[in-house]
Amino acid sequence: QFEQVWLKCDTGMHRLGFIPDEITSARSRLTALSLSDIVMMSHFADAEAPDSALTERQLLRWGQVIDAAPAGSFSNSAATTGQIATTESWVRLGYSMYGGSLVALPGGYSLKPVMQFESRIASVRWIDVGESVGYGGRWVARRRSRIATIPAGYGDGYPRAARDGTPIGTEKGTVLLAGKVSMDMITADITDLPALDVGSPVTLWGDSPYIDEVAGYCDTIGYELCTRITQRTPRLFHRLTGERD
């Protein structure tokens, strides 16, 4: 026997759920099974655009079904942090739990990313003007260049689609991806930061560069990058011990 059942209404996403005209019947069937703790739920298709016609249509349909329900859940991260007013008992946070970029937060607040994808420089070499780096010779040196090899590639979850110029963070500043992403390695132009050397830590995404910035260079979204980290990549978890940690 289930203590609680969540009943999904398809208000416009059209993936799962009962259409509004079917909700009353579905709820009655659950009640007949002595299931009284029923939470109505739905999902926004365009929460990043609170004034869109689709969002307004979904809100209208939601209003038609939620009035008779004791509890409901509609808002995802974007709806929760945006300007969408809903009547509900529960919100469902996903991307915002990672500190991902969302619509503007009230009061000018921002979210702090909780995922840092990091590595260290494993090799450094100089190449002459006209020499290329990586598969296919996509990146070509326009000056004598100092190239760093970083042991992280698409086998670890770094996107193969990343373009030349994708930012990579270091303690001395930002460097740029130079050459195609390999399975186990990427390369970066560190000519302008002579203090960088073998062993220097790098941030592929995290505080800087932000995951959504990297995603923009890969023609994807930060949500996808969060899910791409492979099993072989070591995880290090930090326990928060206070408000300032």
Where are these regions (language model features)?
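C-terminal accessory subdomain/extension
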Residues: 126-245
